[in-house]
Design a protein with these regions (language model features):
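Juxtamembrane loop-transmembrane helix junctions in multi-pass integral membrane proteins
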Residues: 89, 93, 132, 176-179, ...
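N-terminal, membrane-interfacial amphipathic/helix-forming hydrophobic leader that caps
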Residues: 1-128, 276-310
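Residue-level signature of transmembrane alpha-helical cores of multipass secondary-active transporters
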Residues: 45, 49, 98, 141-146, ...
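Transmembrane helix-loop-helix hairpins at the membrane interface
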Residues: 6-12, 26-29, 150-156, 161-310
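Interfacial segments of alpha-helical transmembrane regions
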Residues: 130-151
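Short amphipathic alpha-helical coupling elements at transmembrane boundaries
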Residues: 127-134, 206-211
Length: 310
């Protein structure tokens, strides 16, 4: 029976922000935060961006190199690099492993972001990005944002078609080379990629830039950075890259207007969800159409593995 000075608790349901002290439970207090006035600067934000790129380039190697050794490749051979590269772009299992490696890459990137933003738990994480619904609309804002994400996807498809979307992208070649890769990419696009990408670009990078150089310059810079990093995935298709640029500028403007990151994540997630559904059901639709031979794998297909994020 708790005394008048005690707050009853239940095993497994303790609040991680509550600190027990002499029979009392004291709520852990974080300093006040402003999403438009972060504690980090432009230099730190760009270092985090570079670190996220390096993580996404290195982690896949930890999967493909052991697989190459398992397949009998000799690491002391002068042709090991060439043979491993050939294996990576021709073997369906190797391709699947590289795509699968994006999940721990996302987890590690989120851990890096948490350490950077919170100073290892000294500051709140989500609140630092402006995480919340509109005070006037509440959760109804979510439904509107989902609709906007779906609408943006439709506009993006029309834009890509208008500018030429008939050229197969490197990402499409990668997806068509492995059934397992198709499903993993679809799942990552919905459940992890929107968080990682928004936290990095419109969370860490934009918030520091808008304070240093102003909103307009920050929007343009993030637009360029976001579009540039998708070039390896979607080249040489200018239409698809234009659709990516459209998504980026809308998301960044919404972040600038609302001062909150949650709307960007919801829109990004719904945009990706439409693409993921189409990705999953595409093979079944293709069975009803005349068969066309898939493009031959090339070394350039490895470039999208640096950034399997829609």
């Amino acid at each position: 029976m708790p005394t008048s000075n005690e707050v009853p608790t239940f095993p497994g349901l303790e609040d991680p922000n509550v600190i027990p002290h002499d029979g009392l439970q004291i709520k852990k207090q974080f300093p006040a935060v402003d999403a438009n006035n972060p504690v980090w600067g432009v230099g730190g934000a760009l270092l985090v961006w570079i670190a996220s790129i390096l993580v996404q380039a290195i982690i896949p190697l930890l999967f493909i190199v052991p697989f190459a050794l398992h397949r009998g490749l000799n690491p002391s051979s002068p042709d090991f690099g060439r043979a491993a590269l050939e294996l990576a772009v021709t073997d369906p299992t190797a391709i699947f492993l590289q795509v699968l490696s994006i999940l721990p890459t996302h987890i590690l990137t989120l851990a890096l972001l948490w350490a950077f933003v919170t100073r290892f738990g000294k500051r709140p994480f989500l609140a630092s990005f402006g995480w919340g619904w509109s005070r006037s609309l509440g959760v109804f804002e979510g439904a509107a944002l989902v609709g906007l994400g779906v609408l943006l996807f439709g506009v993006g498809v029309m834009l890509a078609t208008l500018l030429g979307a008939d050229k197969p992208t490197k990402l499409e070649q990668l997806i068509n080379s492995s059934t397992g890769a198709r499903y993993v990419i679809a799942a990552l696009a919905v459940f992890t990629a929107p968080f990682v990408e928004e936290f990095v670009y419109r969370g860490v990078v934009y918030s520091a830039l808008q304070r240093a150089v102003g909103v307009k310059a920050a929007v343009v810079f993030v637009l360029g950075l976001f579009t540039l990093i998708h070039v390896p995935q979607y080249s040489p298709n200018i239409g698809v890259l234009s659709a990516v640029a459209l998504l980026s500028i809308v998301l960044t403007i919404i972040r600038a207007y609302t001062g909150r990151l949650l709307p960007c994540v919801v829109i990004h997630m719904s945009f990706n969800a439409v693409q993921a559904v189409l990705l999953v059901f595409e093979p079944y639709v293709q069975r009803l159409l005349p068969a066309t031979p898939p493009p031959a794998p090339t070394a350039s297909m490895l470039l999208p593995l640096i950034r399997i994020i829609f």
